């Protein structure tokens, strides 16, 4: 932006220009060139059992190592939600056979580049820009996985070829995305380089049997090796052909769910150089623009003298928008976006704002403290290893006053069941949440020291609280 007119992106000249003065949101689509040049418009989650290669597949496709934190690197597991963007290109030379004509690169690659395949001519052209939400596979991190599922449009289900199928979290994650009503799934049979062909075929039959009757029935099963980058271009081709870009709403008031938040200041920074907090998330609808006034709900939560919950929404302004390293003038629904604000950075540090909703002032939904839900319980517990042919434990009915973990979109909060009927329940939430009637929620219960998915529900109505606004 330095030295240029306001409202025009000048960073990264090799990407499409974005100009706020000529922006007409009614003409934008999820495949508009000026949008996908800089940001992803579709979110794809990677799900599956621990150590089946979810993060490695994301790295093979996008070139980004999603494991960001020291304790994650040392233990070689994903703990927080990882994320990475990738551009998928197709060669415009019709003589080039599929799947070689598909290619994936990092998100700041130019939108067109000449072919390097011998015997072909023409350019690789950008066809999709996808965002990967890399979920943890550990059973104790199930809550994080459910938060990630809130923003997914499709999923890659990873199954390691050198273990029998299904492993505990394979089935638990599959149940979770069924709840989220994800229709588009690709199954990746990974680590194919470690097994003989006969084993791979045998496991292929196991996978078919496992997905029968689930939402993943009929999904393509692609044998890959993420480490050797074998068949990754086939995955790219299937992402383009099999996963439709969801229709998006560009004209409503913008709304973004926060799934990460940071304080970007280094310790010892001069006061004048302090930057505001950064919220990362996925826009559900509408378009956010640089310079826009925003509101964050529920905001700062506290209790009054009588112990009642109070919420004070945060009002601020957007200073910058980013998609990975690409700076934006406006951000459309879809991939993960970083929103630089003027909010006090201590409110954003270390994911403190996760589960809050950010959007246009006065256009955000109500804040609920109690929910009345219609719910549906799973028959048996998932994700628990069972010995031999023993069936998994049955899920007990909800009982009054028990404490559950409730996942509403990207927010996990505790909830106490205050009343329960056949398929209706009332839940008093530990933390207030900004949501709408009709929203889906996932319910988990503490079983043997771990939270386990036991069912899901839909919000029928609830008790809302009025946010307090300062009069000064």
Swiss-Prot record:
Member of the eIF2 complex that functions in the early steps of protein synthesis by forming a ternary complex with GTP and initiator tRNA. This complex binds to a 40S ribosomal subunit, followed by mRNA binding to form the 43S pre-initiation complex (43S PIC). Junction of the 60S ribosomal subunit to form the 80S initiation complex is preceded by hydrolysis of the GTP bound to eIF2 and release of an eIF2-GDP binary complex. In order for eIF2 to recycle and catalyze another round of initiation, the GDP bound to eIF2 must exchange with GTP by way of a reaction catalyzed by eIF-2B. GTP binds at residues 51-56, 190-193, 225-227. Residues 39-248 form the tr-type G domain. Its EC number is 3.6.5.3. GO terms for molecular function: GTP binding; GTPase activity; methionyl-initiator methionine tRNA binding; translation initiation factor activity. The keyword Cytoplasm applies. Residues 457-469 are annotated as: Interacts with CDC123. This is Eukaryotic translation initiation factor 2 subunit 3. One of its GO terms (cellular component) is cytosol. The modification Phosphoserine is found at residue 16. It comes from the Eukaryota. Residues 190-193 are annotated as: G4. The lineage of its organism: Eukaryota, Metazoa, Chordata, Craniata, Vertebrata. Residues 225-227 are annotated as: G5. Eukaryotic translation initiation factor 2 eIF2 is a heterotrimeric complex composed of an alpha (EIF2S1), a beta (EIF2S2) and a gamma (EIF2S3) chain. eIF2 is member of the 43S pre-initiation complex (43S PIC). Interacts (via C-terminus) with CDC123; the interaction is direct. Belongs to the TRAFAC class translation factor GTPase superfamily. Classic translation factor GTPase family. EIF2G subfamily. It is found in: Cytoplasm, Cytosol. Residues 48-55 are annotated as: G1. Residues 134-137 are annotated as: G3. Its main location: cytoplasm. Residues 76-80 are annotated as: G2. It comes from Pongo abelii (Sumatran orangutan). GO terms for biological process: cytoplasmic translational initiation; formation of translation preinitiation complex. InterPro entries: EFTu-like_2 (IPR004161), eIF2G (IPR050543), eIF2g_C (IPR015256), eIF2g_dom_2 (IPR044127), eIF2g_GTP-bd (IPR044128), P-loop_NTPase (IPR027417), T_Tr_GTP-bd_dom (IPR000795), Transl_B-barrel_sf (IPR009000). Keywords: Acetylation, Cytoplasm, GTP-binding, Hydrolase, Initiation factor, Nucleotide-binding, Phosphoprotein, Protein biosynthesis. NCBIfam families: PRK04000.1. PANTHER family: EUKARYOTIC TRANSLATION INITIATION FACTOR 2 SUBUNIT 3 FAMILY MEMBER (PTHR42854), EUKARYOTIC TRANSLATION INITIATION FACTOR 2 SUBUNIT 3-RELATED (PTHR42854:SF3).
